[in-house]
């Protein structure tokens, strides 16, 4: 028989740096889950990822206090900032431009994000990522 699901917890956790402090501790503690068990498992699974890269994680909590989790790809905004070596987006995105991104860079990001996007093909994924780039004040070339 399948376990009864009590809830889902969505967090963004830096790769390899999960620890019991907020936001992880309180979120898991409210559901009675073993915080250290999650931290050790998450850090072990994210060893191959660049340390500190924020990763969305969806934790499924069960009635017997056990859990499973799925690690998703880094947010598109983070990948865009990393690709063009940017600290933060523009405060006024449609007025002040903070950088440029090429089609090749967008395709690389889209390939990384493809499994988490609802896009039907690579071109649609590139357009989705380009929209995210525009909304943070980055000029998009070749799309």
UniProtKB/Swiss-Prot annotation:
User: What keywords are assigned to this protein?
Assistant: Methylation, Ribonucleoprotein, Ribosomal protein, RNA-binding, rRNA-binding
Among the GO biological process terms of this entry, one is: translation
Which SUPFAM superfamilies does the record match to this protein?
Answer: Ribosomal L11/L12e N-terminal domain, Ribosomal protein L11, C-terminal domain
One of the record's GO cellular component terms: cytosolic large ribosomal subunit
Q: How is it modified after translation?
A: One or more lysine residues are methylated.
Which GO molecular function annotation, any one, does this entry have?
large ribosomal subunit rRNA binding
**Which family does the similarity line name?**
Belongs to the universal ribosomal protein uL11 family.
Subunit:
Part of the ribosomal stalk of the 50S ribosomal subunit. Interacts with L10 and the large rRNA to form the base of the stalk. L10 forms an elongated spine to which L12 dimers bind in a sequential fashion forming a multimeric L10(L12)X complex.
The record's function comment reads: Forms part of the ribosomal stalk which helps the ribosome interact with GTP-bound translation factors.
Q: Which HAMAP family match?
A: Ribosomal_uL11
Query: Could you tell me which PANTHER family the record lists for this protein?
Result: 60S RIBOSOMAL PROTEIN L12, LARGE RIBOSOMAL SUBUNIT PROTEIN UL11M
Name recorded for this polypeptide = Large ribosomal subunit protein uL11
User: What's the source species for this entry?
Assistant: Variovorax paradoxus (strain S110)
- Gene behind this protein: rplK
